[in-house]
């Protein structure tokens, strides 16, 4: 029953007392029982339970609840008291006045907890220095940089030394010629003429940029979640005087302005109610709040409980996780002991509230609060920016921006006074600590409180007093100006003053309604005003409009309601709004629409559009730059390769590696001389060719030789005390590949005859059994390392090997001499008509080697060339062909003084070195039968020379070998068909020549020489000579070339002086001049031996021991001497000076 009454009362009060500040939600009598668990008896009491609301604007005791009590402490629970008050043992007392309870509520605050983050400077500044000595130091390891170091706890702060800027070369150029449009951070004068001397020596204008701090610092505190803070005070007044015995009501009623609501029901018409007369009483105040929601009076007559708050109309500001900036006390105040709390508590208007995105907690970001040394030092393009760049957006900048907004009538963005309308007094009224932060809550907030009182009944008494609106205005933030504001960009603040014109403290409700269009509704506010006093809204009401238009007159009605909801005063409030001032848009720049983004090309488009890899026009038109670049790369690579090839040829790197075939045939008693090293001539007449075996002379003839003759012979021999047969000359061109050599002489098939009886021998096709070989010519070809370490004389020059000579392997054996009267049959030729395979049993042809293409079978110019019998002059066992460059024959003897030392060497020209060597001529033909005819010389580069030699030998006379071959001699010592038949022989050179200066190899040449494998031997050629091959072995000896033993085709008669040199002692590999060598060899017998092969050169031009000649005797030659290498070093190629 009681619950039903309470619900009906709540509905009634909600409909009729919605504007009341302390509204009773429910009230009724209720028997409350308590069980303590000690006993099963219930402690029950009948109480009046009242649930009411308390608003946040109810700060004065303008309402009171009066609980009627007949007596107190009645022993039997009945009133009036059954005992007498005069009885000292009677505790029951009848009350003269009701129990009075009033409730008030403090202002409501939204409090935010604080958490310290860091300290932030008020305004970091840049200091610019211009060192007088134009030296700026900003290194990380500088002890004394120009800006100095900051320290923190005795440790240097990284990057606190600032940075330096100087004029660049381009800035000096631009400033000098007046075309500079760029700035420098310190506005440096980069003109060259400002200080030309210093700029010339590299001391350009320079500036140092240092970071310093303002003395004022702020502490940053992060805001936590908001909580509501308020306090409800319950004042309980208990009367102490007993009630009078007379009537409870006075005969003369007193009326007042208070209203009363009685919770007791009566069937009779309500009697007039009067305010209870004041009576002596005791006062007790109970406090309720979110922290302590329960309280009871000392007499246990009343208990109170805070149930909670109803929802507000306006939410709290969403500023959690923002940072509150609180100024720190100055250092002077801290040093004097000024308390921080007092400083902060009296300076809350300087507090600022910032979002975290505006801060740099680590100091690495520019233009943010907290910018540090690293951000300042490493700012992008620091030297090209304006001074103080990277230092904007600091606390001072934000504060000044807020002041500018306030001056324009706008609300600040960072000051915390934006929540109070610019009033600082509201912030100071918060009762929290000095580092507490709370914002006032102006929205309606109703707290539910339940009171339980042991009373018979209750009534609510509310003060009602008239009020008046004394003033109202719409102003801008902080009241800078009134009358209106800027629409949307700002908001208006309604300031209202009211006065309580009654005699009681009363509550009032202020509303703003009936506004013009597009004015946002405004929430009502409540005030408690003392009797006869005036009050103002603090903070003021906020007024928003919802358009950007300018309006001269907008209106709203301001009404004042009293405590019971009656309008006690109202007025019309007029204001204006200005149009919103939008940010000015930038103008200028490009006014067109542009061409838009292009279509991206990929590799697939180019591959389908340009299929020709060399279609340059397609590449350019289709913009296939990758393919165009690829083509340019290929062409460029080829050109670079050709350039490197030219350089290699110029310096002899490639030419010294180019293989050439210089036969190593043997110059033996019966065969032609060995092939040379390929500097120009053919085998028998090869330059530096194989040695020609010396003819053993009778003792008388030997003793009859004059000293010049013996000295002439000694030029070709260096081995002490040894009659060296077939001594070969080392190749003149210094090949970096190491030793390449020809073959030595092969074994004899017939016995060699004496020179005096050689012409008596029959010229048949059988082999003549002869005697032993002459001298040391019986063994195969060989070479010795010791011979390389000795100076050798060749061509009138004294050569000296380098200190570290490359070992030259032993020379190969030369081929055996051919028989008399033998001729090649048609079956000896292969199916393709090529010459018979050379080296029947002894030689091993090589398929090919680098630099020279050579087939296993040499091709003769005439496929039917063969051997001739001894009578006709069979082909001698000539050496392999040279590998040289064709040159025209000389026209006359060279004008060189007789007996003079050879001219100094010179390098060949680039054109000469770039021209690849061509194959040299064939080997020399064999001598005529019976020794009657002189042997032909080795062939030159043309094929005619070798053949003519063979033909001449068959006819019994020698013939010229070729352009550069030494002529063979006829039996009478003549030189048929020679280049200079009438040239007088020059005297022999002196025995001692001045040693040429040694030329050391480069590292590349030495490395190549050590790492290159030796080349294999070559192969013979037929008697006709041809380009590379040597001739076949013949019956008679021939002068097969210019070996060390080269000379006459047959020895002179005993006692006759030896012939002189055939040509002047000049060396000209490109001029085709004959070279001068030692004394001529003896004539070979019928069916003589194969000649010993000449050895190849080492790394430099030097002589070496030639291959040894074979044994004497006739018989068909089984194989010629092996070919020597064709390498030569064009860098060290000697050539006669230009004529």
From Swiss-Prot:
Disulfide bonds join 33-44, 136-164, 147-210, 165-383, 167-190, 366-390, 475-482, 515-556. Changing residue 366 to A: Decreases expression at the cell surface. Decreases ability to mediate gamete fusion. Glycans are attached at residues 497, 577. Changing residue 661 to S: No effect on expression at the cell surface mating structure. Slightly decreases ability to mediate gamete fusion. It is found in: Cell membrane; Cell projection; Cytoplasmic vesicle membrane. Residues 887-904, 978-991, 1054-1067 have a biased composition (Pro residues). It is a single-pass type I membrane protein. Residues 241-283, 689-719, 741-1139 are annotated as: Disordered. Changing residue 368 to A/M/R: No effect on expression at the cell surface. No effect on ability to mediate gamete fusion. Pfam families: HAP2-GCS1 (PF10699). The protein present at the cell membrane is rapidly degraded after fusion between male (minus) and female (plus) gametes, contrary to the protein present in intracellular pools. This may represent a mechanism to avoid fusion of several male gametes with a single female gamete. Changing residue 662 to S: No effect on expression at the cell surface mating structure. No effect on ability to mediate gamete fusion. Residues 652-1139 are cytoplasmic. InterPro entries: HAP2/GCS1, HAP2/GCS1_dom. The keyword Zinc does not apply. One of its GO terms (molecular function) is lipid binding. Both the cytoplasmic and the extracellular domain are required for normal trafficking to the cell surface, and thus for fertilization. The extracellular domain can insert itself into lipid membranes, probably as a trimer. The extracellular domain has structural similarity to class II viral fusion proteins. Monomer. Homotrimer. Membrane contact and insertion (via its extracellular domain) into a lipid membrane probably triggers trimerization. During fertilization, required on male (minus) gametes for their fusion with female (plus) gametes. Required for membrane fusion, but not for the initial adhesion between gametes. Inserts (via its extracellular domain) into lipid membranes (in vitro). Probably initiates the fusion of gamete cell membranes by inserting its extracellular domain into the cell membrane of a female gamete. This is Hapless 2. The lineage of its organism: Eukaryota, Viridiplantae, Chlorophyta, core chlorophytes, Chlorophyceae.
């Amino acid at each position: 029953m009681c619950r039903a009454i309470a619900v009906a009362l709540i509905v009634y009060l909600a409909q009729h007392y919605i504007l009341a500040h302390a509204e009773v939600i429910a009230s009724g009598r209720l028997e409350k029982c308590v069980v303590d668990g000690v006993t099963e008896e219930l402690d029950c009491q009948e109480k009046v339970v009242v649930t009411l609301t308390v608003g946040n604007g109810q700060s004065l005791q303008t309402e009171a609840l009066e609980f009627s009590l007949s007596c107190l402490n009645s022993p039997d629970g009945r009133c009036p008291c059954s005992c007498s008050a005069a009885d000292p043992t009677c505790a029951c007392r009848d009350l003269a006045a009701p129990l009075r309870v009033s409730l008030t509520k403090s202002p409501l605050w939204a409090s935010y907890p604080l958490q310290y983050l860091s300290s932030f400077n008020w305004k970091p500044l840049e200091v610019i220095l211009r060192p007088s000595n134009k030296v700026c130091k900003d290194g990380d390891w500088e002890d004394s940089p120009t800006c100095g170091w900051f320290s923190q706890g005795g440790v240097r702060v990284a990057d606190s030394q600032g940075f330096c800027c100087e004029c660049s070369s381009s800035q000096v150029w631009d400033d000098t010629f007046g075309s500079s449009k760029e700035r420098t951070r310190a506005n440096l004068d980069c003109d060259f003429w400002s200080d030309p001397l210093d700029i010339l020596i590299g001391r350009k204008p320079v500036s140092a940029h240092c970071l310093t701090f303002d003395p004022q610092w702020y502490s940053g505190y992060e805001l936590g979640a908001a909580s509501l803070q308020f306090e409800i005070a319950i004042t309980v007044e208990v009367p102490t005087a007993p009630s009078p015995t007379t009537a409870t009501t006075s005969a003369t009623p007193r009326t007042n302005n208070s209203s009363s609501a009685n919770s007791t029901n009566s069937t009779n018409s309500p009697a007039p109610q009067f305010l209870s007369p004041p009576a002596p009483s005791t006062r007790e105040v109970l406090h309720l709040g979110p922290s302590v929601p329960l309280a009871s009076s000392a007499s246990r007559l009343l208990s109170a409980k805070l149930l909670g708050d109803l929802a507000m109309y306006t939410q709290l500001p969403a500023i959690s996780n923002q940072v509150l900036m609180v100024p720190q006390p100055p250092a002077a105040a801290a040093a004097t002991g000024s308390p921080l709390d007092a400083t902060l508590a009296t300076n809350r208007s300087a507090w600022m509230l910032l979002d975290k995105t505006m801060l740099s907690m680590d100091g690495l970001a520019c233009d943010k609060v907290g910018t540090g040394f690293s951000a300042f030092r490493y700012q992008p393009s620091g030297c090209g920016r304006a001074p103080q760049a990277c230092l904007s957006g600091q606390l001072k900048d934000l504060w000044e921006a807020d002041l500018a907004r306030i001056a324009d009538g706008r609300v600040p963005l960072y000051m915390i006074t934006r929540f109070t309308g610019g009033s600082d007094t509201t912030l100071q009224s918060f009762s929290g600590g000095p580092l507490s932060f709370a914002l006032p809550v102006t929205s309606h907030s109703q707290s539910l409180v339940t009171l339980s009182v042991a009373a018979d009944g209750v009534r609510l008494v509310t003060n009602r007093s008239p009020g008046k609106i004394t003033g109202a205005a719409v102003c801008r933030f902080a009241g800078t100006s009134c009358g209106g504001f800027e629409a949307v960009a700002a908001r208006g603040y309604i300031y209202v003053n009211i006065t309580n014109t009654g005699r009681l403290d009363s509550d009032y409700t202020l509303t703003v309604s009936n506004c013009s269009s597009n004015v946002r509704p405004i929430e009502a506010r409540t005030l408690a005003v003392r009797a006869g006093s005036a009050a103002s809204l603090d903070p003021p009401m906020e007024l928003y409009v919802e358009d950007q238009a300018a309006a001269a007159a907008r209106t709203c009605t301001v009404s004042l309601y009293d405590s019971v909801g009656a309008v006690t005063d109202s007025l019309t409030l007029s204001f204006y709004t200005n149009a919103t001032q939008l940010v000015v848009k930038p103008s200028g720049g490009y006014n067109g629409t542009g061409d838009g983004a292009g279509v991206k090309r990929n590799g697939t488009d180019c591959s389908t559009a340009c299929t020709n890899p060399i279609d340059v026009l397609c590449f350019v038109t289709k913009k296939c730059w990758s393919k165009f670049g690829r083509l340019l790369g290929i062409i460029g690579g080829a050109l670079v390769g050709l350039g490197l090839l030219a350089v290699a040829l110029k310096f002899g790197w490639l030419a010294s590696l180019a293989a050439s075939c210089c036969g190593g045939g043997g110059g033996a008693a019966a065969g032609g001389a060995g092939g040379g090293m390929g500097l120009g001539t053919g085998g028998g007449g090869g330059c530096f060719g194989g040695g020609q075996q010396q003819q053993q002379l009778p003792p008388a003839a030997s003793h009859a030789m004059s000293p010049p003759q013996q000295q002439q012979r000694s030029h070709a021999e260096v081995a002490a005390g040894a009659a060296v047969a077939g001594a070969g000359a080392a190749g003149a061109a210094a090949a970096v590949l190491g030793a390449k050599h020809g073959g030595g002489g092969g074994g004899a098939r017939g016995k060699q005859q004496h020179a005096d009886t050689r012409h008596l021998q029959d010229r048949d096709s059988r082999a003549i059994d002869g005697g032993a070989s002459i001298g040391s010519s019986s063994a195969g070809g060989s070479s010795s390392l010791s011979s390389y370490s000795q100076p050798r004389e060749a061509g009138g020059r004294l050569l000296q090997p380098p200190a570290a000579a490359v070992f030259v392997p032993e020379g190969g054996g030369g081929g055996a001499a051919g028989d008399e009267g033998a001729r090649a049959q048609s079956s000896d030729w292969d199916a393709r008509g090529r010459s018979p395979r050379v080296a029947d049993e002894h030689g091993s042809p090589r398929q090919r080697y680098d630099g020279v293409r050579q087939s296993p079978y040499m091709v003769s110019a005439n496929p039917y060339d063969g051997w001739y019998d001894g009578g006709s002059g069979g082909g001698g066992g000539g050496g392999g062909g040279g590998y040289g460059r064709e040159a025209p024959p000389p026209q006359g003897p060279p004008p060189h003084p007789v007996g003079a030392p050879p001219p100094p060497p010179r390098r060949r020209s680039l054109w000469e070195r770039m021209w690849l060597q061509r194959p040299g001529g064939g080997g020399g033909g064999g001598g005529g039968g019976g020794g009657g005819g002189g042997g032909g010389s080795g062939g030159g580069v043309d094929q005619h020379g070798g053949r003519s030699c063979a033909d001449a030998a068959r006819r019994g006379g020698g013939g010229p070998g070729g352009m550069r071959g030494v002529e063979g001699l006829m039996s009478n010592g003549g030189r048929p068909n020679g280049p200079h038949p009438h040239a007088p022989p020059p005297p022999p050179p002196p025995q001692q020549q001045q040693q040429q200066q040694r030329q050391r190899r480069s590292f590349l040449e030495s490395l190549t020489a050590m790492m290159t494998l030796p080349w294999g031997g070559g192969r013979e050629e037929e008697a006709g000579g041809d380009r590379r091959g040597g001739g076949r072995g013949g019956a008679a000896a021939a002068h097969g070339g210019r070996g060390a033993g080269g000379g006459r085709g047959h020895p002179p008669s005993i006692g006759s002086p030896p012939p002189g040199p055939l040509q002047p002692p000049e060396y000209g590999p490109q001029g085709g001049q004959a070279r001068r060598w030692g004394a001529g060899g003896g004539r070979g017998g019928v069916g003589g031996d194969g000649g010993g092969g000449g050895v190849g050169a080492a790394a430099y031009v030097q002589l070496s021991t030639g291959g040894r000649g074979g044994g004497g005797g006739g018989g068909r030659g089984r194989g010629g001497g092996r070919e020597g290498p064709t390498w030569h070093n064009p860098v060290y190629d000697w050539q006669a000076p230009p004529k």
